[in-house]
Amino acid sequence: MAIVYAQFAAAQTHADGLAAMQLENWDKAISIYTALTKANPADQTAFLILGSAHLAKGEKDKAKAAFDAAFNAKPDSPLAFVVNGRITMLKNDIVETDVQFKKAAKAGKKDSNVLRQIGESFLYTPTGVKPNFVRAEEFLKMSYEANSKDYTTLMTLGYMYKEKPDGGLAAQQYELAEALEPKNPLPKFMLAKVYKAAKLKDKYLDYLDRTIAISPRYTLALRAKAEAFYYDRKYDKATVAYKALVADGDEVTVEDEMQLANSLFITKDYPASITLVEKIIQKDGSKNYLRRLLGYSYYETGDYPKGMGIMTDYFAKVTPDKVLATDYQYLARLLVKSKGDTLTAVENFKKAIAMDSSTWSLYKEIGELYYSKRDNCNAAMSYQMYLDSVPKPEATDLYKLGLAQYYCKDDTLRYQKAETTFLRITQLVPTAGIGWLWSAKAATKLEPDVQAHPEMAAQFGRARPYFEKYVGIASVDKEKNKKDLIIALEYLTYYFFLQGDVEGTRTNATKLLELDPANQTGIELMEAVKSGTMVPITPGTPGAPGTPTPPVTPTPPNSGGGKG
């Protein structure tokens, strides 16, 4: 066994242990210093630092055992007094602790290691006990005065100030240590950590780059750089950095590979994400998270059957507390693409929204699914919920809502709602004809039936301003807009006829007949104008001779979503 520890210790040094302590990797520190003490049972410093690591981890009994071993290693050395002080500290005997440390300082007044170990006694404390930075600083400064070129003392001073926290003094000590060992990546990396705590992003990244420049395989710096870009949402840079980490790092974990896969997905390099995820799953199939990412990626590449299979497998294995809203979102999309299962897809979209209200934009997809099934009422409801949360609605989305409202047969107010919605389009894009046209179509549904109720003729005309706006816009390209222009001009010709406006009737009938010479409404009303027999229907008049039948309510064109 001693041979095994000796071989392990040969690969470990006090410098490795110092790095583990600086980085607060207590388990690694314990492993290193345990090996060092096994290889050299007389190494009091290793035992003392081993005890400090156990204390930092909250293992008071193990710390006591390490201190006892340190004393037994050399009972007559100055460090033995340090050991005694630490043991009395564990007993909260402040007076005796002070006595022992004074003896240690006197015996080792020119020994920077002894003085540093006294200082560290106040720095690494049991769980729940705050470090005494004043006493730690006192003895660490004494250690520095004993040997201003001692790298370990400078690093410990830097760590003490970092924890205090005093970023300026911490940086100063780490810079001095860096000057002593310019090829050592640790001081540079610790400086990066100081600048990160100070929220000096540029200096943080600069020192990470300096660390990597002298130690290209230094995993902690490679990982920190990738994470900095990732959490700053600079995903392209994060992807490059994660690639460097996975390719060059000396302690790469599966979590690092997973983060690279995630970054590849975010940057839309789906094939690369798929390749990496499948590689990781082959090594470790327990990472169910990766099945999610794989399913997402297959959807994005258009391989819907594979994506559906992966997500089915994922949901069979995942526990409910691990499911994300995006899981339901992608499952819904895959259900539509691979199976055409609209109803189940809608259920999953709703689960996603219920789980995460920030995914409210999915109501738009729900609305489109309902509309594709001609379920106009549910489509209208879903589009409305989507638009209620949109700060600045798009005209195309309002158009879809308006159509769904227009064709929702179960809503007695469908035409009023549709008219209001289409008018919002005219406010957004007043020079586009579509909003005016559909506002008019909705309004015509709300016009009085003057054939059945001639006394209501004066109330006819709700759609007039909308149709007039539409004609003004659409007449620029009469051939393209011919069908809807005919509908608009039929209405306007009839409106002016009802009002007894000869010139208005003539003008619109002329335009109508130019487009459609055989148009019955245009022919009849133009004849009435020419014959001088045009008599408007007025309230109280049961009818008027020669009054033509009003134009049929316009049938919406197929391009306008004519489903109902």
Q: Where are these predicted regions, by residue range?
A:
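Alpha-solenoid helical repeat scaffolds
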Residues: V4-G500, G504, N508, E514-P517, ...
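Long, low-complexity, intrinsically disordered segments
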Residues: G546-G564
